[in-house]
């Protein structure tokens, strides 16, 4: 719970400036260059008390002090405008002025007079006698509305103050189940505060652990552990600009449950002496109150079932309602900007991760050879190389051959046998002696083929018989599996587990024809599926040449 620092005296509105903030804080006194801090001349008709001014000490999230002078009848809006002018804050919609009441921060309604938030000494006249000078009235500039994306804050100065506020909240955080998040936040904070890690400058104890870690982590891990491991995490943020590191810190800090939230203590019953319930106003949510009661109706429950808590006084309920209403209205205004930023970030992520589909030149050439006049597309071509059909149109085999340097991928060959050629093969078994059904030697060769990454291609022509062995690298198979799609993985599984009927493929073709252009004659040939072999007979004058794989 957000608790103000100690050492402010009994009355938090009247505080000795020498005791707070901690040492090292910078005090910004009014000067002629800052006209917002200059005293205004009284106008005609104003009484003596209206012409007097009060000293107000405003503490910023960066531990800076602003010493301002405002009129007795000034409103919170006037003081807030002076703070923004002196601190050079242009985008101040996420900040607000608050005072401490009962050890809680109460945000001011800027339309109300300051006399309602300070003690009764505010209206007392000054005596020019020997009376000691008064201590200034203390106010705080704090983050009133949280936002998880720091890019919504357009002003650099306002973003830095927002970062300083979250950094102070992280030091008071108690999320023990997110210990690793605090080390990530510390690394981002070091990158934002100190820049790139340099071995010469950032050696030894170049940062104070108490300024970047909660006390419970320092007690649990120790200072030596933090100083030993944090330089490595700091070096990992190399290349991250201070602005990007600050935005990363804001985003990660808002993911902690007890950082972007305002806590208020409530009573569950009127008779309770001390508050027993803590209400947290987080990034989203709307609450309703009635008089001294704060009434919360949960979404999805009947109207009769309500959670009722008591604030103790009407003044607290009124200001709590004002804070809830203002937070809700602000998030409604910021929602379109957040959506645009989210879409832009998603578009940037898509540019970093793209999917590439690579196809072979042979496949593109075969796909472009479809007959426009015959009405047959390349999808129905039964004997062309295909990578996209998963069922192969009833074909029984898948052959993968690496024969040329330009053909580097295994492909599915779907070839349907013409009806007349199938009859010729049944009548003439001698023309293809290696296409016998379930031959023992064929099974032995198939097992050897599975073990050895070698393919034998036997070519028999008119005069000579040549045997070629083509070595297939297993690395090519793994590259295919990573580069192909789902269809190729199914075809690869079919190639690993072929049907046991036959492993020999016979192609009867004319000598003057080429295998690269079978689609030109396919439309005129009748086809029939064959379960034993894949045969293609292109009639010609020369005797056929047989390829056995």
Swiss-Prot record:
Q: Known SMART domains for this protein?
A: B41, FERM_C
Give start-end positions of Low complexity composition bias: 430-443
Q: Which GO terms describe its cellular component?
A: cytoplasmic side of apical plasma membrane; cytoskeleton
| Coiled-coil ranges from the UniProt annotation | none
Residue ranges of domain FERM in the record: 54-369
Q: Please list the residue ranges that the record marks as compositionally biased, kind Polar residues.
A: 444-462
Provide the residue span(s) of the region labelled Disordered.
1-40, 377-400, 422-464
| A single BP term in Gene Ontology | positive regulation of hippo signaling
Q: Membrane-crossing residues?
A: none
A Pfam family the protein falls into: FERM_N
Protein name listed in UniProt: FERM domain-containing protein 1
């Amino acid at each position: 719970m957000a608790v103000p620092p100690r050492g402010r005296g009994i009355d938090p509105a009247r505080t000795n400036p020498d005791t707070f903030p901690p040492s090292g804080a910078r005090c910004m006194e009014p000067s002629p260059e800052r006209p917002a801090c200059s005293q205004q001349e009284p106008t005609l008709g104003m009484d003596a008390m209206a012409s007097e001014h009060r000293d107000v000490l405003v503490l910023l999230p960066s531990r800076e002090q602003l010493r301002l002078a405002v009129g007795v009848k000034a409103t919170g809006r006037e003081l807030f405008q002076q703070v923004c002018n002196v601190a050079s804050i242009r985008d101040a919609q996420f900040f607000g002025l608050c005072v401490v009441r009962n050890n809680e921060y109460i945000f001011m309604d800027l339309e109300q007079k300051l006399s309602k938030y300070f003690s009764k000494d505010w209206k007392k006249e000054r005596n020019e006698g020997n009376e000691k000078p008064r201590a200034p009235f203390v106010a705080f500039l704090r983050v009133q509305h949280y936002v998880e994306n720091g890019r919504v804050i357009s002003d650099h100065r306002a973003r830095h103050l927002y970062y300083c506020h979250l950094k102070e909240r992280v030091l008071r955080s108690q999320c023990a189940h997110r210990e690793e998040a605090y080390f990530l936040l510390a690394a981002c904070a070091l990158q934002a505060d100190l820049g790139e890690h340099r071995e010469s400058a950032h050696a030894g104890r170049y940062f104070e652990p108490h300024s970047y870690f909660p006390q419970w982590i320092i007690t649990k891990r120790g200072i030596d552990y933090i100083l030993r491991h944090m330089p490595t995490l700091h070096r990992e943020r190399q290349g991250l600009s201070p602005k990007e590191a600050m935005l990363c810190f804001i985003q990660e800090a808002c993911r902690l449950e007890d950082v972007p939230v305002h806590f208020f203590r409530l009573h569950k019953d009127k008779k309770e002496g001390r508050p027993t319930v803590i209400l947290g106003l987080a990034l989203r949510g709307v609450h309703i109150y009635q008089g001294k009661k704060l009434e919360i109706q949960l979404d999805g429950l009947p109207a009769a079932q309500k959670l009722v808590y008591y604030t103790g006084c009407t003044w607290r309920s009124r200001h709590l309602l004002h804070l809830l209403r203002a937070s809700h209205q602000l998030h409604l205004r910021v929602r379109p900007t957040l959506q645009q930023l989210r879409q832009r970030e998603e578009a940037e992520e898509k540019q970093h991760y793209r999917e590439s589909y690579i196809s072979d030149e042979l496949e593109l050439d075969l796909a472009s050879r479809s007959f426009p006049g015959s009405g047959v597309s390349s999808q129905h071509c039964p004997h062309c190389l295909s990578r996209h059909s998963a069922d192969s149109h009833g074909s029984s085999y898948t052959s993968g051959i690496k024969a040329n340097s330009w053909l580097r991928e295994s492909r599915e060959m779907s070839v349907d046998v013409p009806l007349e050629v199938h009859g010729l093969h049944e009548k003439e078994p001698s023309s293809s002696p290696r296409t016998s059904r379930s031959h023992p030697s064929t099974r032995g060769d198939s097992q050897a083929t599975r073990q050895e990454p070698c393919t034998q291609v036997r070519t028999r022509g008119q005069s000579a018989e040549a045997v070629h062995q083509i070595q297939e690298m297993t690395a090519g198979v793994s590259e295919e599996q990573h580069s192909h799609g789902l269809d190729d993985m199914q075809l690869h599984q079919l190639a690993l587990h072929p049907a046991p009927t036959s492993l020999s493929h016979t192609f009867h073709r004319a000598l003057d024809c080429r295998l690269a252009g079978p689609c030109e004659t396919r439309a005129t040939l009748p086809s029939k599926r064959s379960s034993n072999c894949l045969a293609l007979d292109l009639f010609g004058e020369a005797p056929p040449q047989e390829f056995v794989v």
